[in-house]
Amino acid sequence: MDTDILRMQDKEVFEAIAGETLRQTETLELIASENFTSRAVMQACGSLMTNKYAEGYPGKRYYGGCEFVDIAENLARDRAKKLFGCQYVNVQPHSGSSANMAVLFSVLKPGDRIMGLDLSHGGHLTHGSPVNFSGQLFDAHSYGVDRETGCIDMNRVEELALEVRPKLIICGASAYSQGFDFKAFREIADKVGALLMADIAHPAGLIAAGLLSDPMPHCHFVTTTTHKTLRGPRGGMIMMGSDFENPLGITIKTKTGSRVKMMSEVMDAEVMPGIQGGPLMHIIAGKAVAFGEALQPAFREYAVQVRKNAAAMAESFAGLGYNIVSGGTKNHLMLLDLRNKEVNGKVAENLLHEAGITVNKNMVPFDDKSPFVTSGIRIGTAAMTTRGMTENDSRTVAGLIDQVISSANSAGVEEICRTVRHDIRELCLAYPLEGYGVNP
């Protein structure tokens, strides 16, 4: 990657980027929410489209000179529709949280009841956490996983829905290794007159590849990030399988009177000007490139390998005596409960960092430790698969992680971390990230 101008103009920023480049290329990225974009995506994101203001939507902008950014946004929208089989898409949200906020604000009033997966059971901040807008502006109620199986108890979901009668049910997670039964969630939502939103930020790439159940036929709204398993730039997106009249009865004047606005109209207005102003057109261009890549046959091969790698790694961990929440994985991630290993998530994360392996500490269901300590770690295979690693490498990595965690309380842990770091560097150099270097 050409960074000569940056190196000459701003050495401090250049050195920060150079250090991050070295970290990404020579250490192993296993954070489940991270991935590596293609050079084409990075070129689009680094293009001069970053200079253009484009408030509004293609063909209806508040600024002139938008003919070319209109092309980029229309490409992103059309490709996303084809990729996910949806009728409506908005590619302007800056993040997954922004996308979720737009949906909630478009169909709810402050104080309305919502239901989502408990954050400590694998949910997300925007699904009703009390420290987030979703839990502060709305009356949030959480469902969780079964203590024995680690899987979502749909009977309990139904019981809670019948009890609290939410206006919106959210199905989605940030640390749940099983799939979601969107059909069952829709049946529950219909029983209580609730709308249903699927947050597929984590498994979006696997869903696009047809490897996990499709939320479009069952959910009123589907939100996602565009990075993670989609391998695009950091951003968000809102989709609907089909359009419908908005449930709040918001109307618009017509030549002959008025009509009820379609949900797509309400949603577009909620994104802009509701919660955002100008879209990030360079990022939207990057989204278009990423969606184009995801439409190619090679992307499905990638997604298949992501699942194979996760399954192989989970099987290896189970064989080494680790407790995997929910008993295994059907997607790209797994959550390890380390309580039987006598080490907490914070210690494990720090030691693995010293060993050249990046994971994140994570609460496990019914955790008795704080979110800053936790009893578990979350591991994902999306990024390592982008490098070209396969099942054997996944098993090797599980063994190296075990070496570090098993020695956490021993006097020789520092030496083991140094040895593992060397092995990890050799593994990463065997699967280089093409085009990610910086000019010295």
From Swiss-Prot:
HAMAP family: SHMT. Pathway: One-carbon metabolism; tetrahydrofolate interconversion; Amino-acid biosynthesis; glycine biosynthesis; glycine from L-serine: step 1/1. Keywords: Amino-acid biosynthesis, Cytoplasm, One-carbon metabolism, Pyridoxal phosphate, Transferase. It is found in: Cytoplasm. Belongs to the SHMT family. The gene is glyA. Its cofactor is pyridoxal 5'-phosphate. The modification N6-(pyridoxal phosphate)lysine is found at K228. It comes from Chlorobium limicola (strain DSM 245 / NBRC 103803 / 6330). GO terms for cellular component: cytosol. It holds the Pfam family SHMT. Its main location: cytoplasm. Homodimer. This is Serine hydroxymethyltransferase. Catalyzes the reversible interconversion of serine and glycine with tetrahydrofolate (THF) serving as the one-carbon carrier. This reaction serves as the major source of one-carbon groups required for the biosynthesis of purines, thymidylate, methionine, and other important biomolecules. Also exhibits THF-independent aldolase activity toward beta-hydroxyamino acids, producing glycine and aldehydes, via a retro-aldol mechanism. GO terms for biological process: glycine biosynthetic process from serine; tetrahydrofolate interconversion.
